[in-house]
C-alpha cells in the first residue's frame, strides 16, 4: 500500500484503513504526519486505521511533494523486508543471461570500436516503441527481454532491463536499481513506494532518462 494524500482542496478529515489476516505481520508507517494509527483485531483480521485532520491542498506542480514533506503518505506491506520486496523485481531482471540478448549485442556491435558500443546499444533501445504503463499498472511484472526484442516495444522498466542486459553482454557495466518516492523505514518501503527504475552505469552517466529521481 502506498497512499499519498494528494487532494486539490483542503481536507478536514481523511480516513484510511488497511486490513490483513490477523496472523500476518504488517509493516506500516505514516510519513509527513503525526496521527497515531488505531489497530484492532476484528473477525480474524488486523485492521490499521489512520484518521488525518486538516490536510492542506496539494499543488500538482510540486515534483516531489512526498519527499519535500508537503503531503502525508501512508505505507503498508507484508514483506519481511525491503530486500524481500525487491526480489519480486530482481528475479525478472534476467536480460543479460538470455541467449537472444547476447546474440543481439554481438550483432549490433559487429565492427564497432569500444567508444561506439554504448551509443549503438542506447540508440537501439531508444528506437523501440514505449508503453506508458507504470510498474503498478503491470502488476510489477516485467516481460522477458526476448519478448521486448520480438515485439519491438516495452515499458520503461522493460527497456531499462533490456539495455542493462545488452551492456552486460557487451562487457560493459549496467545494473538496474530503484528510486523510492518517499523516505521511510526500510521495512515499510514495499513495491508501491517505488517511483522509478533507473540504470546505474558509468558508461551512460548523465543520460537523464536512465538516472534516478526522487532519491
Task: Locate each region found by the language model.
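Short, conserved helix/loop micro-motifs enriched in His/Cys and acidic residues
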Residues: 129-152, 184
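Active-site-proximal cofactor/substrate-binding loop regions of enzyme domains
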Residues: 114-120, 125, 132, 146-151, ...
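Secretory-pathway-linked proteins and extracytosolic
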Residues: 1-138
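Conserved aromatic-histidine-acidic binding/catalytic patches
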Residues: 4, 109, 148-155
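Residues embedded in well-ordered secondary-structure elements
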Residues: 5-7, 145, 194
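Short secondary-structure boundary segments
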Residues: 58-73, 152-168
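Hydrophobic/aromatic-rich core segments of domains that either
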Residues: 157-215
Amino acid at each position: 500500500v502506498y497512499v499519498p494524500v494528494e487532494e486539490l482542496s483542503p481536507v478536514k478529515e481523511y480516513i484510511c484503513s488497511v486490513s490483513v489476516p490477523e496472523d500476518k505481520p504488517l509493516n506500516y508507517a505514516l510519513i509527513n504526519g503525526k496521527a497515531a494509527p488505531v489497530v484492532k483485531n476484528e473477525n480474524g483480521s488486523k485492521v490499521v486505521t489512520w484518521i488525518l485532520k486538516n490536510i492542506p491542498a496539494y499543488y500538482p506542480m510540486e515534483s516531489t511533494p512526498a519527499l519535500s514533506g508537503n503531503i502525508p503518505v501512508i505505507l503498508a506491506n507484508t514483506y519481511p523486508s525491503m530486500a524481500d520486496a525487491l526480489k519480486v523485481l530482481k528475479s525478472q531482471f534476467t536480460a543479460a543471461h538470455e541467449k537472444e540478448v547476447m546474440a543481439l549485442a554481438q550483432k549490433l556491435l559487429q565492427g564497432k570500436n569500444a567508444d561506439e558500443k554504448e551509443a549503438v546499444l542506447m540508440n537501439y533501445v531508444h528506437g523501440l516503441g514505449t508503453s506508458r504503463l507504470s510498474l503498478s499498472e503491470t502488476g510489477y511484472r516485467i516481460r522477458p527481454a526476448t519478448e521486448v526484442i520480438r515485439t519491438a516495444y516495452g515499458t520503461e522498466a522493460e527497456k531499462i532491463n533490456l539495455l542493462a542486459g545488452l551492456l552486460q553482454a557487451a562487457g560493459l557495466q549496467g545494473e538496474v536499481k530503484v528510486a523510492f518516492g518517499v523516505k521511510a523505514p526500510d521495512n515499510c518501503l514495499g513495491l508501491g513506494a517505488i517511483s522509478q527504475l533507473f540504470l546505474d552505469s558509468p558508461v551512460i552517466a548523465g543520460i537523464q532518462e536512465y538516472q534516478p529521481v526522487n532519491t
